[in-house]
Amino acid sequence: MAEYSYVKSTKLVLKGTKAKSKKKKSKDKKRKREEDEETQLDIVGIWWTVSNFGEISGTIAIEMDKGAYIHALDNGLFTLGAPHREVDEGPSPPEQFTAVKLSDSRIALKSGYGKYLGINSDGLVVGRSDAIGPREQWEPVFQDGKMALLASNSCFIRCNEAGDIEAKNKTAGEEEMIKIRSCAERETKKKDDIPEEDKGSVKQCEINYVKKFQSFQDHKLKISKEDSKILKKARKDGFLHETLLDRRAKLKADRYCK
């Protein structure tokens, strides 16, 4: 086992070359994976498909068929709008609603006419209420990458043969599948807590801090000539900033050093 470890740690020319190639491939795969994630996002223009309850806020649209959205009529009823054929063509103003969160699982929806969406006694979706009551509460249901919208009568919405939007089925089939699209600014990646100066190699890190704190009286960077291995150990032990400050102090390259 000891001999095997020794052989594995020995840097041969060919092995070293492969190792670098493997590292490069690993970075390329990571970059490609991130690009694929962006590509796989279901986006039409500025309208992207939400994948969880937390993403539902502000102006949204409800897509029931490819490019076809729930469309508000001026009589308080709703129908399925004409499909938008253009690749980047999002929902029109009558197809846009304001989502209001009521709890951890329920929302209210307000049309462009200023009325809240609810259901009547016949199970039809209507938008005639000025306030949010029990009938104006909706529950988005996410399962296996699909989504449906549950009304207050415990039925899922769909578009019937007459073109009306109704909620009459207790179970969700293909006809009840929807997409909620949002035009809110999407948070693509969480920002890390690492300062920009601390990123990169220890040598680059030292240069970053010298640039940040040096007084630049002679317009030249003063970088310590001491071994950078000290910095590597300091970073590992959690004393990088203190070590960098000491190195700058020796060169009097920090305007805050006495």
Swiss-Prot record:
Pfam families: FRG1. A motif (Nuclear localization signal) lies at residues 22-32. A motif (Bipartite nuclear localization signal) lies at residues 235-251. SUPFAM superfamilies: Actin-crosslinking proteins. It is found in: Nucleus, Cajal body; Nucleus, Nucleolus; Cytoplasm; Cytoplasm, Myofibril, Sarcomere, Z line. Keywords: Actin-binding, Cytoplasm, mRNA processing, mRNA splicing, Myogenesis, Nucleus, Ribosome biogenesis, RNA-binding, rRNA processing, Spliceosome. One of its GO terms (cellular component) is Z disc. It comes from the Eukaryota. GO terms for molecular function: actin binding; RNA binding. GO terms for biological process: mRNA processing; muscle organ development; RNA splicing; rRNA processing. Binds to mRNA in a sequence-independent manner. May play a role in regulation of pre-mRNA splicing or in the assembly of rRNA into ribosomal subunits. May be involved in mRNA transport. May be involved in epigenetic regulation of muscle differentiation through regulation of activity of the histone-lysine N-methyltransferase KMT5B. Homodimer and homotetramer in solution. Identified in the spliceosome C complex. Interacts (via N-terminus) with KPNA2 and NXF1/TAP. Interacts with F-actin with a stoichiometry of 2:1. Interacts with KMT5B (via C-terminus). Interacts with GARIN3, SMN1 and PABPN1. Overexpression of Frg1 leads to development of facioscapulohumeral muscular dystrophy (FSHD1)-like symptoms such as kyphosis, progressive muscle dystrophy and skeletal muscle atrophy. It also causes aberrant pre-mRNA splicing of Tnnt3 and Mtmr1, affects the localization and activity of KMT5B, and leads to increased levels of Eid3, resulting in inhibited muscle differentiation. These results suggest that human FSHD1 results from inappropriate overexpression of FRG1 which leads to abnormal alternative splicing of specific pre-mRNAs. PANTHER family: FRG1 PROTEIN, PROTEIN FRG1. This is Protein FRG1. The lineage of its organism: Eukaryota, Metazoa, Chordata, Craniata, Vertebrata.
